[in-house]
């Protein structure tokens, strides 16, 4: 056991394959202590140390925590150096070399898989830091595992990097109206670290699928499971034929937008493009358009969520698994295997086994509420105290609710044409602080000026300056990056809030037979027993109140969620 490590204190851990654990921590005088513990069962040792309640520090959850999660160990607290490097320095990588370099103000190094350089070869084999300050690529490739002393030195370097990161996030401004004891960027670093751990857990646990229900849905939508490529092609032609039968003339390739536009002209429908939203108004009066739109839904399922998807991504234990990421460019979580875009038609199959249920919570109007908090707009914050904030916005704008919703969304996404244009003028008059905040972000994007989200994530727009300078300030490129920045400061902050909420829910579920099984931008799914569902629902809701109390501190913004207990995801309304 590491001597002197208290609850919540950083404890760097490196798993040495076949040898044990390397640990590093600070003693009472601030010095770094390190040791290697030889053990045939490092996971069991971590579980023992977990009783002390340390904040585990690792280079990345994917590299260290995956083995712990697979063995049933769910750490309570962690600091993920890779995740914090993405937050603090705006990195697109989270490997040890990039995180170390960023923490020390060095240029981002090449990935360690490349050829060794003269600087790598010039040093001694045990020189972990090169003459230029970068980490040795031999060590990045795993040379630290050669002996116990090297492994403990690697853990000490990990702890040093964490300390530099903590100093960095604590130095960032806390933009809340009422700051707390711990600055918001530091709290964001903690929740981003937990999100990286949660991503590993989501990959391990998977999403429960009722295979019989799924197979019935797929059969009804795209046809029986094909036994050959010929059968698959025949099923595709059969789906196409349903649409062709509704139109006069020869069949066309329904996957070619230009040909589909010509096809629509045969029934008197002239449209500039064939996007589904543009065709939907015609569906009620035109059976041909209705058939085309139904075909598109079936085609999407067939090509993205068909039989091959089910065979590839759903395990023998009837769990849908994909690769999860804790943050993309603006901070949102990502997932493969279609987890973030599962069609509504297939959601009845997201259903745990008998005796278990899903607690589903959907954040209400989260991005507009976040805009109210991060912009400091008192009038918009007042609207955000209501269950439905679009209702008071409509009254303030003198419009109906649908127009008010369009105006708020258009403001965040930079839309200025159509019905949004007139409504935006009223937004400027009624919510000047929110609109000024969005315009400032857009201008920064157009000029290639770095931004930080409310929680401290660096959006590295300065890397675009050469491109923007060549294109010009009024170019399509400049407008595109401006709109990206305008939305990213809201969407990124909303992602930070969501992950802070998810981390709080995860902590609240400790000891319960319950696991988070899906994170979907503004929606959370927790699988639990029917007996514990009510208590778990209470944890989810109290976690949102708790998170909102410090994340929105002083803004007056209220967060709301629609929480329900359901047997399948489709039952949630």
What does each of the following model-derived ranges do?
Residues 78-79, 358-362, 561:
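Short hydrophobic beta-strand that contains or immediately precedes a catalytic carboxylate
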Residues 305-312, 328, 360, 379-381, ...:
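Short, contiguous acidic/charged loop-to-helix segments that flank catalytic cores in large enzymes
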Residues 218-253, 430-432, 436, 441, ...:
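Polymerase palm active-site segment centered on the conserved acidic dipeptide of motif C
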Residues 200, 204, 392-519, 530, ...:
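Conserved catalytic core of nucleic-acid polymerases
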Residues 152, 320-400:
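Function-dense linear segments that define catalytic or interfacial modules
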Residues 62-73, 85-92, 260-268, 364-379:
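Short active-site loop/helix that positions an aromatic residue
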Residues 1-22, 26-32, 139-344, 355-357, ...:
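Conserved "right-hand" nucleotidyltransferase catalytic core of DNA-directed polymerases
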Residues 3-175:
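Conserved DEDDh/DEDDy metal-dependent 3′-5′ exonuclease domain
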